[in-house]
């Protein structure tokens, strides 16, 4: 069984960070080692929350503990998401290096959580670290549209510009870029776009965009997690991408149908493993 060290936020109530990632990966047959960067009562979009960030030294100590019992060689991938402090970002790099020293075949998937144009933000210093340093150590990066713009330092309005931006980012280190949400000025307003780019291919896919009054939090976290799991399970890039699109759609649709704000991950678990609705991806740049 594949093992993922998932370094993300934790909420006591609801689904965000590891709370949106652990269950989908496990439901797909991947073992998860959750390492929480923060412990909050709930996600921050409620406007009020309690809790705090975990000290970076404690994160390092926990991973050192795993190494001390000889388990780090079993780690097949590291997935990082929301970081609470710049020191945690540096700790993630040290953790990735430790994992790769123990298992040279391990992959690092970086979800560079910086927030959205209109939504949440991260603490000062984290965005700069993610932009400056993380591409150099990442095997795969999973930004949303606004995060991709920050990573390359310019606005992106079309699919072609997004593909070019991903390829530019890949020159700094990543072998693949998954754009979890792509805003394309030429797309229909009721479509949610995703894009995945490698050195040899680029695939685009769409699912319905559900008109929530308040968009659920954790969709991006779940998207990265499903893609990590399907990749580790041996899917091709296209297959992992399409399964991710379909599984996430199933959860979001169940959330919409239930009239909920928090993701209906448990209710939609069978569709995470075996989605009923499938969305075919298409080549947008054969490279």
UniProtKB/Swiss-Prot annotation:
<feature type="binding site">
    <location>
        <position position="111"/>
    </location>
    <ligand>
        <name>ATP</name>
    </ligand>
</feature>
<dbReference type="GO" id="GO:0005829">
    <property type="term" value="C:cytosol"/>
</dbReference>
<dbReference type="GO" id="GO:0008478">
    <property type="term" value="F:pyridoxal kinase activity"/>
</dbReference>
<comment type="similarity">
    <text>Belongs to the pyridoxine kinase family. PdxY subfamily.</text>
</comment>
<dbReference type="InterPro" id="IPR004625">
    <property type="entry name" value="PyrdxlKinase"/>
</dbReference>
<dbReference type="GO" id="GO:0000287">
    <property type="term" value="F:magnesium ion binding"/>
</dbReference>
<feature type="binding site">
    <location>
        <position position="180"/>
    </location>
    <ligand>
        <name>ATP</name>
    </ligand>
</feature>
<feature type="binding site">
    <location>
        <position position="221"/>
    </location>
    <ligand>
        <name>substrate</name>
    </ligand>
</feature>
<feature type="binding site">
    <location>
        <begin position="44"/>
        <end position="45"/>
    </location>
    <ligand>
        <name>substrate</name>
    </ligand>
</feature>
<comment type="subunit">
    <text>Homodimer.</text>
</comment>
<keyword id="KW-0418">Kinase</keyword>
<dbReference type="InterPro" id="IPR013749">
    <property type="entry name" value="PM/HMP-P_kinase-1"/>
</dbReference>
<feature type="binding site">
    <location>
        <position position="147"/>
    </location>
    <ligand>
        <name>ATP</name>
    </ligand>
</feature>
<dbReference type="GO" id="GO:0005524">
    <property type="term" value="F:ATP binding"/>
</dbReference>
<comment type="function">
    <text>Pyridoxal kinase involved in the salvage pathway of pyridoxal 5'-phosphate (PLP). Catalyzes the phosphorylation of pyridoxal to PLP.</text>
</comment>
<protein>
    <recommendedName>
        <fullName>Pyridoxal kinase PdxY</fullName>
        <ecNumber>2.7.1.35</ecNumber>
    </recommendedName>
</protein>
<keyword id="KW-0067">ATP-binding</keyword>
<feature type="binding site">
    <location>
        <position position="9"/>
    </location>
    <ligand>
        <name>substrate</name>
    </ligand>
</feature>
<keyword id="KW-0460">Magnesium</keyword>
<dbReference type="InterPro" id="IPR029056">
    <property type="entry name" value="Ribokinase-like"/>
</dbReference>
<keyword id="KW-0808">Transferase</keyword>
<dbReference type="Pfam" id="PF08543">
    <property type="entry name" value="Phos_pyr_kin"/>
</dbReference>
<dbReference type="InterPro" id="IPR023685">
    <property type="entry name" value="Pyridoxal_kinase_PdxY"/>
</dbReference>
<keyword id="KW-0547">Nucleotide-binding</keyword>
<comment type="pathway">
    <text>Cofactor metabolism; pyridoxal 5'-phosphate salvage; pyridoxal 5'-phosphate from pyridoxal: step 1/1.</text>
</comment>
<dbReference type="GO" id="GO:0009443">
    <property type="term" value="P:pyridoxal 5'-phosphate salvage"/>
</dbReference>
């Amino acid at each position: 069984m594949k093992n993922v060290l998932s370094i993300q936020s934790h909420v006591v109530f609801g689904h965000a960070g590891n709370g949106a990632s652990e269950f989908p990966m496990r439901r797909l047959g991947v073992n998860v080692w959750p390492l929480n960067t923060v412990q909050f009562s709930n996600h921050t979009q409620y406007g009020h929350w309690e809790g705090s960030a975990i000290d970076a030294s404690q994160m390092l100590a926990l991973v050192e503990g795993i190494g001390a019992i000889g388990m780090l060689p079993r780690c097949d991938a590291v997935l990082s998401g929301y970081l609470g402090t710049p020191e945690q970002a540096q700790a993630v790099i040290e953790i990735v290096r430790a994992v790769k020293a123990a298992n040279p075949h391990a992959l690092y998937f970086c979800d560079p959580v910086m927030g959205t144009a209109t939504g949440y933000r991260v603490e000062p210093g984290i965005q700069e670290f993610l932009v400056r340093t993380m591409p150099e150590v990442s095997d795969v990066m999973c930004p949303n549209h606004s995060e991709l713009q920050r990573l390359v330092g310019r606005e992106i309005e079309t699919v072609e510009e997004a593909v070019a931006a991903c390829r530019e980012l890949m020159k700094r280190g990543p072998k693949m870029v998954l754009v979890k949400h792509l805003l394309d000025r030429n797309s229909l307003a009721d479509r949610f776009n995703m894009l995945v780019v490698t050195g040899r291919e680029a695939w685009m896919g769409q699912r319905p965009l559900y008109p929530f009054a308040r968009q659920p939090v954790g969709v991006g976290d779940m998207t990265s997690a499903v893609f990590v799991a399907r990749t580790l399970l041996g899917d091709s890039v296209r297959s992992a991408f399409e399964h991710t699109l379909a599984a996430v759609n199933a959860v979001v649709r169940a959330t919409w149908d239930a009239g909920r704000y928090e993701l209906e991950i448990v209710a939609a678990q069978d569709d995470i493993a075996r989605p009923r609705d499938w969305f075919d991806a298409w080549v947008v740049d054969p490279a």
